[in-house]
Amino acid sequence: IGDVPGREDDLQGKPFLGPSGQLLDKMLGAIGLSRPSAGKPSHVYLAPFLPWRPPQSRRPSPSEIAMMAPFMRRHIALAAPKTLVLMGGIACDALLGKSNLTDLRGQWFEFEGIPLLPMLSSDYLLRVPSAKKLAWKDLLALKKRLERE
């Protein structure tokens, strides 16, 4: 679960596109996963926490986040994932009640009985390439958890 759609996502109506989506695809591929594509099944399901991009790319307001939280909880219940990955502080704040992603990343939590791993977003990694080694550690932890399931 990401935070909000990027510009490219908003224009095309699909999540995780553009350069950050390409990096996310590489990250998933590095641990043997891929996003769903036409005719190709996948164990990966991607969704932004907020389904729209706020005007001027501003941070969503607390009322917008609070309004969407029940919808995301229901979305998660319907998708019935075995593992959740939160890629962004907004999603962490809404679902864990904690927003400092740099402190949360790398630690496992539970959300309604589902193992949950906060990770740095691919968008953040494009802005701060030095954080990629932290993301790699998180990806390896995710891979290890998925192999046990």
What are these language model-derived features?
Residues I1-E149:
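A polyanion-binding, active-site-adjacent surface
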